[in-house]
Curated annotation (Swiss-Prot):
Signal peptide: none annotated. Residues 9-41 form the LisH domain. Positively regulates the activity of the minus-end directed microtubule motor protein dynein. May enhance dynein-mediated microtubule sliding by targeting dynein to the microtubule plus end. Required for several dynein- and microtubule-dependent processes. SUPFAM superfamilies: Lissencephaly-1 protein (Lis-1, PAF-AH alpha) N-terminal domain, WD40 repeat-like. It comes from the Eukaryota. One of its GO terms (cellular component) is dynactin complex. This is Lissencephaly-1 homolog. Gene3D superfamilies: 1.20.960.30, YVTN repeat-like/Quinoprotein amine dehydrogenase (2.130.10.10). Its main location: cytoplasm. GO terms for biological process: border follicle cell migration; centrosome localization; centrosome separation; chorion-containing eggshell pattern formation; clathrin-dependent endocytosis involved in vitellogenesis; dendrite morphogenesis; establishment of mitotic spindle orientation; germarium-derived cystoblast division. The gene is Lis-1. InterPro entries: Dynein_regulator_LIS1, G-protein_beta_WD-40_rep, LIS1_N, LisH, PAC1-like_LisH-like_dom, WD40/YVTN_repeat-like_dom_sf, WD40_repeat_CS, WD40_repeat_dom_sf. One of its GO terms (molecular function) is dynein complex binding. PROSITE patterns: LISH, WD_REPEATS_1, WD_REPEATS_2, WD_REPEATS_REGION.
Amino acid sequence: MKMVLSQRQREELNQAIADYLGSNGYADSLEAFRKEADLSTEAEKKFGGLLEKKWTSVIRLQKKVMELEAKLTEAEKEVIEGAPTKNKRTPGEWIPRPPEKYSMSGHRASITRVIFHPIFGLVVSASEDATIKIWDFETGEYERSLKGHTDSVQDVAFDAQGKLLASCSADLSIKLWDFQQTYECVKTMHGHDHNVSSVAFVPAGDYVLSASRDRTVKMWEVATGYCVKTYTGHREWVRMVRVHIEGSIFATCSNDHTIRVWLTNSRDCKVELRDHEHTVECIAWAPEAAASAINEAAGADNKKGHHQGPFLASGSRDKTIRIWDVSVGLCLFTLNGHDNWVRGLAFHPAGKYLVSASDDKTIRVWDLRNKRCMKTLYAHQHFCTSIDFHKAHPYVISGSVDQTVKVWECR
């Protein structure tokens, strides 16, 4: 179908083309075009940069159309497949869906970790640019930056009330930040001999645990900043530390392909979990609500009856996710589907689903009961490094090597 321009539109287009040719140094072409199009040599200011503006707005509109088409296709697919539509789904069944609600830019290097504030509508991101940034996930607005580290910030964690933020860095330090009023660094702890890769508060908030490339895990007293315990046992770089909600145990994972579960109060390793064939990048404790789905999934593989848990998920460079019963040191089942390293894990608060982030640039939503990937989100332009699920609101956030933080609405 041929599009017909009005006389006025044709004149404006000719003027815009003439302006483009002139401002980009195509003098000969401009002269020939002016002659053929019968244009005066007087360029009007209003046509300055008009062609570029129209061109970029067309691209922007095309992108919007593609997003809307993707949404429509997804909605149609759900209706055809008989999946519960939004009206029929309960909040416990809501999962992140494309496109993203916000894409937040500002970091000047890869994003290493993204987390939600436990109470306020805020997101915190850590980056290889040595800064920590705070964002409002309800508006997509940037709030502020926390500066103090001198090398890549590897992990961030809140205490239960969200009053203190802990961060750790390749500069060998752990920092505590006042998140109530001043947003200043209130303590810096030194003691590790290499890159500090992960940090976590114990639930009571009086101690912080840190994991390092020096193969150790250390416990620090928040009030004094002193190191009170060192846990040794991993044979290589300790990648992540995560404390169980009850606080009596915590888990670590490492480049030595293992996961260790430790007793917080002693220095003893309770159990070592071995089944991964490569570095274990990330771990996540399952909420109590996930027990029935995990038991049902495990029952299909082994008839050993009811598993008590606690349950832990682990993601590895071997591209798999494993679900473990920590009480017996047993891998209950494996989730396969990612095409590259698994970098981040987060359980749905209602316990039915697990979301994962990977270097294959996707976020995957796993139906635990059926042990299958039920949705794949093509989330980022580069490796997807971190993911978090809000405990009370229907949002997921992801961070990437593409330097963006994305907010995904669950529905």
